[in-house]
Amino acid sequence: MAQDFNVTPWEVKGKVDYDKLIVQFGTQKITSELKEKIKSIINDELHVMLRRDVFFSHRDLDLVLKDYQDGKGFFLYTGRAPSLGMHIGHLIPFIFTKWLQDKFNVNLYIEITDDEKFMRNPEYTLDQTRQWAYDNILDIIAVGFNPDKTFIFQDTEYIRNMYPIAIKIAKKLTFSEVRATFGLDTSSNIGIIWYPALQIAPTMFEKRRCLIPAGIDQDPYWRLQRDIAESLGYYKAAQIHSKFLPPLTGPEGKMSSSQPETAIYLTDDPKTVERKIMKYAFSGGQPTIELHRKYGGNPDIDVSFQWLYMFFEPDDNKIKKIEEDYRSGALLTGELKQILIEKLNDFLEEHRQKREEAKKLVNVFKYDGELAREMWRKIHE
């Protein structure tokens, strides 16, 4: 039987079967034993996204935890290809990464790939992608990272420091490997063929194991890294993978910046949020109130419930009650949507305030913070 979904770094199609994806990608499921181990190490409750399997898969997370317990430590790395506007789905890896940084007190490197975005789309100018980089950096800083343990860098600015290690990586990668991994062809520009070397480079910023929290669609990059890292004297990168926050339009695919009806942007005002949720959020309810009261709704396919479950309602007792009431028909689709609208608007209001404050912190994260200063003095070999 043909697989009815497809996941690559560039697109996600169909309703993703995450158990099948683990087998297809050759990753490991995050087991209850692994969760308990994290809990005992941090001596605290797990993040809601870990408790509820939003982060569900990994490579070498067990080795990262062992290194931490043995006193070797580890570091975090994630990134962002800048776009005109960030949406709620873009924040998931950053919010979870902040939690990891807080709990383990480790360095974090955030790569802003203004170069990749420019090279990938023939219509974009470098000025555009650099402006988007600045705007997106404000949203990232607003998440609340430790300014002295976080280095945010743009590829077009930090390239001199990365270039020696990047060319060593590039020399290890063949065109056929890169082409097969990313679906490139003879019409692909040579910049995008070379680019994977730059995305791999930050995994070698320290002589420790690197942990990358990211959507599972980004996994192919790190397979290439894992093939070559040890030959360059570095660790294979470890990963912890997230599921996709479903688009408003239903359980298939993922949110897209280029399709406004699929996403809530971080800049959406309260009225826009309400309009989008009421109009577009896919419902698991019945066609009439009478039928819904009688038969109940299906939270498994209801986007409003899924957003609350994955992100916006961290209280386990409250989410259980919402699920029970929706399944029984006691809670209507419109009422469920209103719960999400209120949570979303509260979140976005707080984010907007933090984003405004972030304007004063850009230089700290990029140039003047403790880790940033140290990184600008380094040439990575």
From Swiss-Prot:
<feature type="short sequence motif" description="'HIGH' region">
    <location>
        <begin position="82"/>
        <end position="90"/>
    </location>
</feature>
<keyword id="KW-0547">Nucleotide-binding</keyword>
<keyword id="KW-0436">Ligase</keyword>
<dbReference type="GO" id="GO:0004830">
    <property type="term" value="F:tryptophan-tRNA ligase activity"/>
</dbReference>
<protein>
    <recommendedName>
        <fullName>Tryptophan--tRNA ligase</fullName>
        <ecNumber>6.1.1.2</ecNumber>
    </recommendedName>
</protein>
<keyword id="KW-0963">Cytoplasm</keyword>
<dbReference type="GO" id="GO:0005737">
    <property type="term" value="C:cytoplasm"/>
</dbReference>
<dbReference type="InterPro" id="IPR002306">
    <property type="entry name" value="Trp-tRNA-ligase"/>
</dbReference>
<dbReference type="InterPro" id="IPR002305">
    <property type="entry name" value="aa-tRNA-synth_Ic"/>
</dbReference>
<comment type="similarity">
    <text>Belongs to the class-I aminoacyl-tRNA synthetase family.</text>
</comment>
<dbReference type="InterPro" id="IPR014729">
    <property type="entry name" value="Rossmann-like_a/b/a_fold"/>
</dbReference>
<dbReference type="GO" id="GO:0005524">
    <property type="term" value="F:ATP binding"/>
</dbReference>
<keyword id="KW-0648">Protein biosynthesis</keyword>
<keyword id="KW-0067">ATP-binding</keyword>
<dbReference type="GO" id="GO:0006436">
    <property type="term" value="P:tryptophanyl-tRNA aminoacylation"/>
</dbReference>
<dbReference type="InterPro" id="IPR020653">
    <property type="entry name" value="Tryptophan-tRNA-ligase_arc"/>
</dbReference>
<dbReference type="Pfam" id="PF00579">
    <property type="entry name" value="tRNA-synt_1b"/>
</dbReference>
<keyword id="KW-0030">Aminoacyl-tRNA synthetase</keyword>
<feature type="short sequence motif" description="'KMSKS' region">
    <location>
        <begin position="254"/>
        <end position="258"/>
    </location>
</feature>
